[in-house]
C-alpha cells in the first residue's frame, strides 16, 4: 500500500459524509413514493 498524504485523508472524510447524505435523501424519496402509491 502506498502512503497517502494527510490532505487526502481530510478530503476522503468529506466525501464519505457527502455520500451518506445522498443515501439518506434517496431513502426519504422512496418513502414518499410508497406513501403515494
From Swiss-Prot:
It comes from the Archaea. The keyword Ribonucleoprotein applies. The keyword Ribosomal protein applies. Disulfide bonds: none annotated. Keywords: Ribonucleoprotein, Ribosomal protein. GO terms for cellular component: ribonucleoprotein complex; ribosome. Interacts with N(4)-acetylcytidine (ac(4)C) 1459 of the small rRNA; the acetyl group of ac(4)C1459 briges the interaction with this protein. Part of the small ribosomal subunit. Belongs to the eukaryotic ribosomal protein eS32 family. Initially thought to be part of the large ribosomal subunit. Crystal structures show eS32/eL41 to be a small ribosomal subunit forming a bridge at the interface of the 2 subunits. This is Small ribosomal subunit protein eS32. It comes from Thermococcus kodakarensis (strain ATCC BAA-918 / JCM 12380 / KOD1). The gene is rpl41e.
Amino acid at each position: 500500500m502506498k502512503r497517502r498524504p494527510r490532505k487526502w485523508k481530510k478530503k476522503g472524510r468529506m466525501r464519505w459524509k457527502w455520500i451518506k447524505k445522498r443515501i439518506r435523501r434517496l431513502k426519504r424519496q422512496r418513502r414518499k413514493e410508497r406513501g403515494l402509491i
